[in-house]
Amino acid sequence: MAEKLKVDTDEYYFRRPTKEDGGPVWELVREIGNLDLNSSYSYVLWCEVFAESSIVVEHKETQQIVGFISGFMHPEKEDTLFIWQVAVSSTQRGKGLATKMLLQLLEWNESVNFIEATVAPSNKPSNYLFLGLARKIHTNWKISDYFKTDHFPAKDEEHEEELLFRIGPMRKNKNKRMI
């Protein structure tokens, strides 16, 4: 069972998800509308099984989940956190919440030396997020081809290619709180 870390800021609680968060996370992703919406079961399962490498943000005043990152430790690269989805409520955008969630995940997972994520070229917010993270923590980044359009079924509305972002190595500073 994952230790349920919780970080308190003026406006938010940053914490590891629980299976009870799966439904609200599904609602958040559905509300956002520009992410691939998976089954509600997958979010419940993700919040339970991959809690150590994921994060939710709860708004203090409304007690609503307003942010979520799903991640997992790459099975072939033990020092690499792979980020699958980044979701921020439209009511909370422009506050740096996605970056703060990534920084908190790095603080909680000290063994992480690299972050990877796939991003479509047209997804400017995610492009800016990962490049901005690399700049903020003063580390390297590499962008390479990963999934071509022909990797996806033709019935998938001609899914756009996905580029692989690799951020790192991380420079650890144990005395610095990240968010």
Swiss-Prot record:
InterPro entries: Acyl_CoA_acyltransferase, Ectoine_EctA, GNAT_dom. Pathway: Amine and polyamine biosynthesis; ectoine biosynthesis; L-ectoine from L-aspartate 4-semialdehyde: step 2/3. The keyword Acyltransferase applies. It is an enzyme of class 2 (transferase). Residues 12-153 form the N-acetyltransferase domain. Pfam families: Acetyltransf_1 (PF00583). Transmembrane segments: none annotated. One of its GO terms (molecular function) is diaminobutyrate acetyltransferase activity. One of its GO terms (biological process) is ectoine biosynthetic process. Keywords: Acyltransferase, Transferase. Its EC number is 2.3.1.178. NCBIfam families: ectoine_EctA. Belongs to the acetyltransferase family. EctA subfamily. This is L-2,4-diaminobutyric acid acetyltransferase. It comes from Oceanobacillus iheyensis (strain DSM 14371 / CIP 107618 / JCM 11309 / KCTC 3954 / HTE831).
